A protein has these predicted regions:
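Extracellular/periplasmic, surface-exposed regions of secreted and cell-surface proteins
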Residues: 1-105, 246-277
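Active/binding-pocket-proximal capping segment
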Residues: 15-20, 28-30, 196-200, 207-211
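Flexible, solvent-exposed coil segments and beta strand-coil junctions
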Residues: 25-35, 155-162, 232-245
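Conserved small-residue
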Residues: 38, 55-169
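C-terminal extracellular loops and terminal segments
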Residues: 40, 44, 86-101, 168-180, ...
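Subset of outer-membrane beta-barrel
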Residues: 57-62, 174-206, 268
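Exposed, low-structure sequence patches enriched in small/polar residues
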Residues: 108-109, 123, 180-182, 193, ...
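Extracytoplasmic gating/loop element in the C-terminal half of outer-membrane beta-barrel translocons
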Residues: 197-277
């Protein structure tokens, strides 16, 4: 503590290794089933947690104190089954966090008469076939039309397949912070808490137009694609995602988590009312 106990806190660093995790893993279907529960895998967590407490103002009748918290954690899969292979079914990848989004990368929205270069391939709209074709006449992205999500060809073969999926981001934040304040004035207490989450990748349900239904998503105010509004930010309302892919966004946000106002009734008033503490 410092400044006559007006400032205090602590810093914790940690490294945690966990092995023999009970997880469901896939096995060849020839066994009669395709998954079993097994003690497999190793993970490593490391991070830092910081807490600071301060007395900002203190007089006879007034006190204002604050508490600040910061937490950063990094986890990764060290080993799965001991063979060095990833588990695509469960979306587990060696060297990556346990909870990740694994999907196609959306580069934008297909436009009418679209034509672009990617990984040495030329992709263009064929009006006769109503398809986007590569230079060999192969369909680049099955079912794609103007207003569809434009997916990235990651492996460079000139067409979209399951091999083009990638790790989009972590489901857990890069770091979190919170700031709490408590103000006391005589018998009154007022407190509030802010929470902050930074660097988390979220699935954007608002972009999944095929799921629009009463009470779920609404199109009001959404800048969706139409021939008259050829936006590159959102697909058309009739778009059905290829291979059930979805949309993601890396987010940071701060929220007011809690507000409390309290009053401590003096014992003298309680006694007059016949109430004992």
């Amino acid at each position: 503590s410092f400044l006559n106990n007006r400032l205090s806190g602590n810093i914790d660093f940690y490294v945690s290794n966990t092995s023999d995790l009970l997880m469901k893993r896939t096995v060849p279907i020839m066994n009669g089933y395709n998954s079993i529960m097994d003690n497999v895998g190793k993970t490593r967590n490391k991070g830092v947690e910081i807490t600071l407490n301060s007395v900002n103002v203190e007089t006879k009748d007034f006190r204002w104190g604050s508490t600040f918290n910061f937490a950063l954690n990094r986890d990764k899969i060290v080993e799965l089954r001991g063979d060095g292979n990833d588990d695509l079914t469960n979306k587990w990848f060696i060297g990556e966090p346990v909870k990740v989004h694994y999907d196609y990368n959306v580069m934008g929205t297909w436009q009418e008469n679209d034509r672009f270069e990617l990984n040495g391939h030329t992709i263009a709209w064929d009006a006769a076939q109503k398809k986007y074709l590569n230079e060999d006449g192969e369909e680049y992205q099955k079912g794609a039309a103007p207003g569809s999500a434009k997916l990235e060809d990651r492996d460079g073969d000139g067409k979209i397949t399951a091999k083009d999926k990638m790790i989009i981001g972590s489901k857990l934040p890069s770091f979190t912070m919170s700031l709490g304040n408590t103000i006391n004035y005589k018998d009154f207490t007022f407190s509030f808490l802010f929470n902050g989450v930074f660097g988390v990748t979220k699935e954007m349900q608002d972009y999944n137009f095929e799921r629009w239904s009463l009470g779920y998503n609404y199109i009001d105010g959404m800048d969706y694609w139409t021939p008259e509004n050829p936006t590159n930010e959102m697909t058309s309302p009739g778009y059905v995602p290829y291979d059930k892919h979805t949309f993601y966004k890396k987010m940071n946000y701060v929220q007011l988590k809690n507000i409390t106002l309290g009053y401590n009734i003096p014992q003298s008033l309680l006694s007059k009312a016949g109430i004992a503490a």
